[in-house]
Each structure stands twice: as C-alpha cells, then as structure tokens.
Amino acid sequence: MLGAIWAQSLDGIIGDGEQMPWHVPEDLKHFKDVTMGAPVIMGRKTWESLNPKFRPLPGRENYVLSSRTPGQWSAGAQVLTAMPSLSDAWVIGGGQIYTATLDQVARIEVTLMGVNIGSTYGEKSIYAPDIPEDFGLAHSTDWLTSAKGHLALPDKEASDLPIKYRFLTYDRKDAA
C-alpha cells in the first residue's frame, strides 16, 4: 500500500521548506512506527531538512525525487526523477511531492497539532494538501498532550506551552 504521512497545524501548515514548526517526540515515534521497514519517498528539500546524523532514515530505503544530479548531497539515498513503482511505501514530503502523489496513495496518516501557525512563515509557508473527498476517516485518537513537545518557530524562543496533538488515519474509500 502506498501511503502519505505528515504533521500539520490546525491551519494546515507543515513547515517552511526548511523545518517543521514544532518538535513533538510522540509524533516522531509515530512516524518511525508507521514507516519503519518500508521505503520512504521524499523531495530534495525534505531530504536536506533531515538532520544529517539521521540521514538516510534507518531501517527504510530512502528515495529522493529530484532533477538534481546525485552527489555528495544525496549520499545514502537513491535519487529518482520520477515516482518509483512501489506497492508498499510512504510519501513523507514535502508539499509539492504530497500534491503530486496524492492521487496514488491509499492511506493518509496525519498528526494534527493543536496550534495555529498563522502568518509566522509568511510566503514561505508550506501547506498540507486538502484530504480528497474519496478518503474517509478510518481512525482518530482523542487529543493528547505532548510530554516534551514544543514549538520551534523562527525568530522566537521555543515555547514551553504544552502542545496538544491527535493522530488521524484516512483511507481511500475504494481501497478500504
């Protein structure tokens, strides 16, 4: 099954093309649990936004969609110019890759962060795609509070306010 996974704010923001606006360990664990053992597909900016000590993501084949020639920047990943034909993989970002592949996925895993980012990133804001109408909510958790999570917004100190989040799973209705 091809799936997509992302975290977004209440107002749909997933980041600024360089980083996510929060650090929520529970979300990182969920991401790891969902994607472990399966190939992951991402764009170059998402690849480059990963901490080099976690790149490539361990326990997963890492595919990077890019027109850029492979080189030192892509060490540990397979660089492709087109979406690979994989029956079991996770699309992990960024915004352009989600939009380009959403018609191919059967499941979408969303971590909804209980924060509004608003105009913090301005024109750099990257938004999650809208969930297509042919997907239905298959599972959701109640709102949870992160024990160690915090906002990590540019030009602001990390917020110690508790971050609420919930996990949402959407399945394509004709694939369920």
Region locations from a protein language model:
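Enzymes that bind and transform nitrogen-containing heteroaromatic metabolites
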Residues: 1-176
